[in-house]
Amino acid sequence: MARVEIEIPDDVTAEVDHLDLTVEGPEGSVTRRLWYPDVDVSVEDDAVVVASEVDDAKTDSTVGTFESHVANMFHGVSEGWEYKLEVHYSHFPMQVDVEGEEVVIQNFLGEKAARRTQIRGDTDVVVDDEEVTLSGPSIEDVGQTAADIEQLTRVTDKDTRVFQDGVYIVEKPAKGGA
């Protein structure tokens, strides 16, 4: 019999459409499907209510998980999420660019072919010399884009003690930061 109310911030609106919760604010909007058997998500007055009539551990933990998702959505649309990555190279000067909806890394370890990865969702990517900044309203989209960029420059066939070239996440939001 878990019931949690998450207060909606002043500059944010929330709306439930069947199983999808849509949250809009000054930084953008985020939609997420929140479904689990016997767990109901609704908007009442100035709060999002996550409730369940079933009293078991799995359902109670799911209510807590949904509470965290909603809090992350509120934080994302009001303040946004930000990751910082740094470009490191010692052998070949690599170049990181944004082309449309892709991040392109050229001359990684002297490779002639460019490495590419998609930018997810509403994530903004800003490349400033040796620093890459990712920001957006969805923590999942921003975090996954950062991880994709980091994995794109992973060195697998050389000694990583010598070849430390790559793009690495150096700053990300703290857990429980919402």
Swiss-Prot record:
Q: Which GO terms describe its cellular component?
A: cytosolic large ribosomal subunit
- Alphabetical UniProt keywords: Ribonucleoprotein, Ribosomal protein, RNA-binding, rRNA-binding
The question of whether Cytoplasm is a record keyword is answered with no
Q: List the disulfide bonds.
A: none
* GO process annotations (BP): cytoplasmic translation
A GO term, aspect molecular function: structural constituent of ribosome
Similarity-based family: Belongs to the universal ribosomal protein uL6 family.
Q: How does it assemble?
A: Part of the 50S ribosomal subunit.
Please name the HAMAP family in this protein's record: Ribosomal_uL6_A (MF_01365_A)
Its function, per the record, reads: This protein binds to the 23S rRNA, and is important in its secondary structure. It is located near the subunit interface in the base of the L7/L12 stalk, and near the tRNA binding site of the peptidyltransferase center.
This protein is called Large ribosomal subunit protein uL6
Classification of source organism: Archaea, Methanobacteriati, Methanobacteriota, Stenosarchaea group, Halobacteria
